[in-house]
């Protein structure tokens, strides 16, 4: 069977949707209302179980690189174990559904009992499915499991590094650790020197984390933005204003804002900043 690692997210989400709706329909069918829910539940549960089998296969194919990340192994194993429990429970559900379909004409009473059993086991399967999803989410969001390595593209890995440095720097700033924030934004700028957004962040850090308006002005002088890009021009202009203020040059900051107001007369933020300086 081919390696399904890169397909794990898609397969998992199909399995979750099919199995959740399948269990819901099976319980509705037991009420005797909405006759279509009985056959629909059988189809959804059988197809969903197939998806669960493939989800475990794709997850097993994907777990190697994720498990080797320091500190992630236990989270990977826990997610994998819940995934296997989910698969096994729904294999039991699928077996009950197949038996119920096979006995429907011979013994309606037995078939009914089998569908009740399917509904009960389906509840247990639903709990296991929730746990597998919860631990899968923890693996991705708390350990970056699989993030940036899905296709083996170095560009994706670099994006992961960029995101990690950015969030670490922002967290340091939130914790009022200016020295750490400045260090991380500086590292970001060293690793991604050609990224305009990163250069803006590094200049902002000179102002906010180091209170070095002169260095920020020097960095801005080396940065050019497209004249037809309003968003970048505004960001450049506001950073220049902040840099002038940090350097103790409020008159230059006001002159910069006045020029921005002439260039972008409809931007309320410029007017608000002018009012603050005045």
What feature does the model see in each segment?
Residues 1-18, 49-102:
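Membrane-embedded alpha-helical segments of integral membrane proteins
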Residues 45-50, 110-135:
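Internal/C-terminal transmembrane anchor helices
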Residues 136, 152-191:
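Alpha-helical segment of the N-proximal tetratricopeptide repeat
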Residues 159-160, 193, 228-231, 265:
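Short coil turns that delineate tetratricopeptide repeat
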Residues 170, 204-208, 238, 242, ...:
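Residue-level recognition of tetratricopeptide repeat
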Residues 175, 209-210, 247:
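Structural motif corresponding to the intra-repeat A-B loop/turn of tetratricopeptide repeats
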Residues 198, 233-236, 270:
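TPR alpha-solenoid repeat register
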């Amino acid at each position: 069977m081919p390696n399904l690692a890169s397909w794990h997210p898609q397969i998992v989400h199909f399995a979750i949707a099919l199995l959740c709706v399948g269990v819901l329909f099976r319980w509705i069918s037991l009420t005797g209302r909405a006759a279509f829910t009985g056959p629909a539940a059988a189809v959804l549960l059988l197809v969903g179980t197939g998806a669960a089998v493939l989800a475990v296969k794709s997850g097993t194919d994907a777990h190697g690189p994720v498990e080797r990340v320091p500190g992630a192994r236990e989270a990977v194993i826990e997610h994998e174990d819940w995934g296997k429990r989910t698969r096994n429970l729904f294999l039991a559900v699928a077996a009950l559904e197949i038996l119920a379909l096979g006995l429907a004409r011979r013994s309606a009473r037995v078939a009914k009992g089998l569908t009740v059993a399917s509904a009960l086991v389906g509840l247990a399967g639903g709990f296991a499915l929730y746990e597998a999803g919860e631990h899968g989410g923890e693996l991705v969001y708390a350990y970056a499991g699989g993030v940036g390595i899905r296709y083996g593209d170095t560009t994706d890995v670099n994006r992961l590094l960029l995101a990690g440095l950015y969030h670490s720097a922002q967290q340091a700033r939130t914790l009022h650790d200016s020295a750490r924030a400045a260090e991380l934004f500086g590292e970001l700028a060293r690793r991604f020197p050609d990224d305009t957004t990163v250069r803006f962040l590094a200049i902002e850090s000179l102002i906010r984390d180091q209170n070095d308006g002169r260095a920020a002005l020097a960095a801005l002088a080396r940065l050019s933005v497209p004249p037809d890009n309003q968003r970048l021009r505004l960001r450049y202009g506001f950073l220049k204003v902040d840099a002038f203020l940090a350097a103790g040059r409020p008159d230059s900051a006001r002159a910069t804002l006045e020029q921005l107001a002439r260039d972008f007369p409809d931007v309320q933020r410029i007017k608000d900043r002018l009012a603050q300086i005045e």
